[in-house]
Each structure stands twice: as structure tokens, then as C-alpha cells.
């Protein structure tokens, strides 16, 4: 099981555009339309599966909200930070 990050570690490592909400890190990715958003969601699902780390993802017209936490650790771990950075990489 992955170790929880401290509050200071989370603050220092939180990727650009991500915010912390309790025991999760959250970002809303914006797109020009639904098809672009769904394409990102599909790519994000592939990254998540490769990492064996499955976020909560919500698609709406022109945006995808992603929430990351490590359930078995009870909060935010290195796995969440790593996947957030990878998701930024396929969007930005």
C-alpha cells in the first residue's frame, strides 16, 4: 500500500491547475466540445488502467472533472500526484 503524503508534501507537489479538496486532488479539464472531452476521457482511462489507479471522472459538455485519491491508503499518495501529472501531459 502507498504511503499518505503529508500536507506539506501535497502543497509542494500539487501539479498545476489541480486543487486539494479534503482527501482528493481535483481538476476540471476544459475542451471545445463534447467529442474533445470524450476523447480526453478515453485517453485518461487508458493512463489510469496502465497505472492501475482509477480516478473518479465526470464528463460534461466541454469539460471533464477528475478526482484522485488512493482509497486503500485513505487519502492522497504519490500515485495520485503521478497520475495527475500524466493527465496534465495529455491535456496541456
UniProtKB/Swiss-Prot annotation:
InterPro entries: PCD_sf, Pterin_deHydtase. GO terms for biological process: tetrahydrobiopterin biosynthetic process. The keyword Transport does not apply. CDD domains: PCD_DCoH. It catalyses: (4aS,6R)-4a-hydroxy-L-erythro-5,6,7,8-tetrahydrobiopterin = (6R)-L-erythro-6,7-dihydrobiopterin + H2O. Pfam families: Pterin_4a. It is an enzyme of class 4 (lyase). Its EC number is 4.2.1.96. It comes from the Archaea. Keywords: Lyase. Transmembrane segments: none annotated. GO terms for molecular function: 4-alpha-hydroxytetrahydrobiopterin dehydratase activity. HAMAP family: Pterin_4_alpha (MF_00434). Belongs to the pterin-4-alpha-carbinolamine dehydratase family. This is Putative pterin-4-alpha-carbinolamine dehydratase. The lineage of its organism: Archaea, Methanobacteriati, Methanobacteriota, Stenosarchaea group, Halobacteria.
